[in-house]
């Protein structure tokens, strides 16, 4: 059955991002919809377990939090097989190469090979983008059955990313 406190703990972890790498207790509570007391208990638990560090005012994830995502990646040998092929492709086209999976209506990058260019996008493993906005996402959505695609599309309204975003 559903364990609400566990779900809240995951929400606290997910509240940290490139935009909010360190946060006060109030910021975590606000971003997660938790009370300050609830957010504090979860942060202190995560700190005791080594997933979060705090200096008395700000909290931040520790490298140990990578273990959570690495468990998925290491359990999927496909990504280990894909990386050499992606490296060859990236070298031949002189562009970065990514592999991703659908997570609802988002794509999550699970492997990425960067090229060395002056200008590049800041997408790494774990980056999440709406599938509808990206070519990779549209390819993955196209592989779904019509019923599954319609069910997913009903869960979230589509928004144009730019004025050029195709909305069909």
Describe these PLM feature segments:
Residues 58-156:
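Amphipathic alpha-helical effector-binding/dimerization core
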Residues 1-80:
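N-terminal helix-turn-helix
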Residues 16, 70, 137, 160-164:
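Conserved short-loop catalytic and cofactor-binding motifs
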Residues 149-150, 158-168:
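Short, intrinsically disordered, charge-balanced linker/junction segments flanking boundaries
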């Amino acid at each position: 059955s559903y364990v609400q406190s566990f779900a809240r703990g995951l929400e606290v972890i997910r509240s940290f991002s490139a935009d909010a790498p360190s946060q006060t207790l109030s910021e975590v509570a606000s971003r997660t919809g938790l009370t300050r007391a609830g957010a504090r208990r979860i942060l202190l638990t995560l700190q005791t377990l080594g997933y979060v560090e705090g200096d008395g005012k700000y909290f931040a994830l520790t490298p140990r939090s990578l273990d959570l995502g690495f468990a998925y990646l290491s359990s999927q040998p496909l990504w280990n097989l894909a990386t050499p092929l992606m490296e060859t492709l990236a070298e031949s086209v002189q562009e970065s190469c990514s592999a991703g999976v659908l997570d609802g209506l988002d794509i999550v990058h699970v492997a990425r090979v960067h090229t060395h260019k002056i200008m590049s996008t800041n997408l790494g493993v774990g980056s999440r983008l709406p599938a509808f906005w990206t070519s990779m996402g549209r390819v993955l959505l196209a592989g779904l059955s019509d019923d599954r695609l319609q069910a997913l599309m009903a869960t979230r309204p589509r928004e144009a990313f730019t004025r050029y975003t195709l909305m069909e």
